[in-house]
Structure formats: C-alpha cells, structure tokens
Amino acid sequence: MLKAVILIGGPQKGTRFRPLSFEVPKPLFPVAGVPMVQHHIEACSKVPNLKEILLIGFYQPNEALNSFLLKAQQEFKVAIRYLQEYSALGTGGGIYHFRDQILSGGPQAFFVMNADVCSEFPLVSMLDFHKQHGGSQSYVILGTTANRTQSLNYGCIVANRDTQEVLHYVEKPGTFVSDIINCGIYLFSPSIFQHIAEVFQQNQQELQLEENSSWQRMEVIRLEQDVFSTLAGRGKLYVYKTEGCWSQIKSAGSAIYASRLYLSQYGTTHPERLASTKEGGPTIRGNVYIHPTANVDPSAVLGPNVSIGMGVTVAAGVRIRESIILHGAVLQDHSCVLNTIVGWDSMVGRWARVEGTPSDPNPNDPYSKIDSETLFRDGKLTPSITILGCNVSIPAEVVILNSIVLPHKELSRSFKNQIIL
Ligand code: GTP
C-alpha cells in the first residue's frame, strides 16, 4: 500500500502570487482549467495501490478547500484528507508532526510533493527506481536538469553517475554546484522519520540552551536543508532524473507558463479538454481550454495557451493569447488580452488592450526552467505579465501594459509599468 502527501503551505506563503492568492488559496488557483493540486491528485490516482492522499498545510479549513476535496475524492476515487498544522512547520516539520496519520495502515512508501510544481509526475517510474535502489531503506528525489545560472535558485544535487546516489545536496547555493535540481517530488520509505527525528532532537538540544524557546521552533524542520543535506553521501538518498516537463509555480507569470505545459500534455492525457475550431465557433490557435459554461463569440480568436474559466463572456472580435481568464470575467467587443491574468468577475471594456510581457524561460535553451521572477530589480518594476485582480473594471479604448491592478479597482485611463493600488 502507498500514500501521498501534498504540501500546500498556508496564507503567509505564496506572497509572489498576490493579488491572486487573496481570493483563493494558491493551491486551488486554476492552471490549465483545473485547480493546481488537481494535477497532483490525478497523477496519484493513477498509481496502483495508492490508497490515501493527505494534504498538509496551515490554511484554516474553508468552504473552497472542503468542496474541492470532496469533489476530487469522488472524481478520482481515492481517499483525500486535509491535515492542518497549527503553524508553519516547514517542509519536513508538517510530515513529522503528522507521521502517525501518514503511517497508519502501514504504507510501504509514500510520495511527498510540493503543491507549487507543475510536472508530468512520473510516479510509477519513481516507484520502479525506488525498488531497484535500496527499497525500504532508501529515499528518492525527482531531479531535472537546469542551466548553470538558474540552478542557483533551486536545491542542487551532486550524484554518482553510475548509481545515482546523492552525494551532496545544497539548497540554493551561492555558486554553481550542479545542474541537477530538486523538483520538489519525493518518494520516502517510512524509515525517513528516523532521520527527521534526528533533526528534531538536534533542534531540541540547541533550543534548550536558549531562553524562551518554544515547542513550535523545535518542530520547524526543512526537508531540503536539514534532512537531505545530512542524508547525502550515506547510501540512502537517490535521484531519479526526469526528461519530462517541469516548472515551479511561484509567481502569477509562472502560472501562465505552467498552464502552457499542462495544456500541451492534454494533447495526450485529456484531448477532450482542448478546444478546436468548429463551424459556428471561435477560431482556436494552438492549445486552448474553454470551460463548458463560458460564452465565446464565434468571431473571437483564442490561443495559443489560453484558459477560459467558468461563466466567462468573450464578446465579438476579441483576441486572447497566452492568458488565463478567471471565472465570471467579461471581455467586451474587440478587446485584446495578451500575456495577462484577468481576475474573477473583472471587466475589460470595448477596444481596450491589456498586455503583459512574458517571463518565459529562454526558448532556445531546453534546460532553462522558469525562474522565480522578481517584481522589482534595482528599485524598478521589471516588465511582467499583466494581472487584473478580482472585480477590476477596465474602461473602453485604454491600454494597460505590464501592470498589476489590485482587486476592486475601477480604472479611468491607460497605465504602463505600474502597480495600481
Ligand atoms: P522559495 O523559492 O523560497 O519559495 O522556496 P522553495 O521553492 O523551496 O519553496 P518552499 O520550501 O517555501 O515551499 C515548497 C512547498 O512546500 C510549497 O508547495 C509550499 O506551499 C510548501 N510549504 C512550505 N512551507 C511549508 C510549511 O511550513 N508547511 C506546509 N504544510 N507546507 C509548506
């Protein structure tokens, strides 16, 4: 029997995802038409004998999360539970705190996945690899190759070329260490908890020496820095390298990039989710997802890489490219939306142009992963995608370029390179 844990973080996390994470917990933000973590859950549901998925985070349980989990449970026919940490315990502290729940029923192994990654989730291949590399006494990290500069933003892995044993692990190194990076997807045998316990005991000893140390601080454990770094070179930690697509979803810009990856996967995994040009329907270019309840005028042109949410209205002559349009939004006649996320219930007026600058990886470099982009560099706003928060209104005939508009704003003129509060 197997299980899976998805680390979903909490409200103080995902700051680079604002203002979109004000409205919906980031793990539920739609990527290629479905909530970000649904992609993880679906991948888990295809692993034979995977009996339970545990989401661990520090969000207060809420209506959106509960109803999503209920629906996903029914759709994917797997037990799913949310376990709430009393505060942020780190990527290792949460699983250690809930170790009894994870181990109940006696799983032979369990996956742990960061919620904010986009992947093909080669979980079955990871299982096979795990069996061939130590089984019950070993742990597997999914790795991929990045270019030298970008590797510095990730956990870097030095591995034995023949055995794939992890010899050295450094999280976000200051100088180049390795081009193999940690994808935030792991397969652990239950014995991993002995190693996390060592870190916990060490924290306890160190903190006992300090006055006013709290129980909570002892429980904060980072899998990457505290556990992987010490396990490396001890014949227990292995890297399974994937050639499949992978990216992180840190900023809103990277959500558009991740949408593109998932939409292209739909070609093989979910062709029914991809729209096509049909008699009497809009013109579709490349991969486009349209929610069945959306109302799209036949003269609109959509794509590539467009996701249209529930109840969205796309009027006559509208052009949309490389964008995510969230539920309830209205794009009026002849408006143009490029490299933008249009927030829930927002309105783009007639002939308005809303445009951002993509923050894609270098298209000529296959090993270039999307970076955690910075909004400001040298005190200046760097060109980014445009984001309209929830319930924003853009008047007719204006241009909004590389800007972020906070929720509930009614604009009256054009803006360029601004955060509109
Ligand atoms: P940054 O670039 O600083 O964001 O680092 P990172 O990519 O290593 O990400 P981080 O470790 O912050 O988060 C990785 C994943 O774990 C994300 O999906 C987070 O939501 C989740 N996560 C981070 N901290 C916690 C925590 O304290 N508890 C839980 N349950 N999840 C967490």
UniProtKB/Swiss-Prot annotation:
Catalysed reaction, written as an equation: alpha-D-mannose 1-phosphate + GTP + H(+) = GDP-alpha-D-mannose + diphosphate
Pathway in which the depicted protein is active: Nucleotide-sugar biosynthesis; GDP-alpha-D-mannose biosynthesis; GDP-alpha-D-mannose from alpha-D-mannose 1-phosphate (GTP route): step 1/1
GO molecular function per UniProt: GTP binding; mannose-1-phosphate guanylyltransferase (GTP) activity
CDD domains, A to Z: M1P_guanylylT_A_like_N (cd06428)
This protein's UniProt keywords: GTP-binding, Nucleotide-binding, Nucleotidyltransferase, Transferase
Pfam family membership, one: NTP_transferase
Gene Ontology terms describing biological process: GDP-mannose biosynthetic process
InterPro entries in the record: GMPPB_C (IPR056729), Hexapep_transf_CS (IPR018357), Mannose-1P_guanyltransferase (IPR050486), NTP_transferase_dom (IPR005835), Nucleotide-diphossugar_trans (IPR029044)
Family: Belongs to the transferase hexapeptide repeat family.
Protein name: Mannose-1-phosphate guanyltransferase alpha-A
Biological classification of the source: Eukaryota, Metazoa, Chordata, Craniata, Vertebrata
Name of the gene: gmppa-a
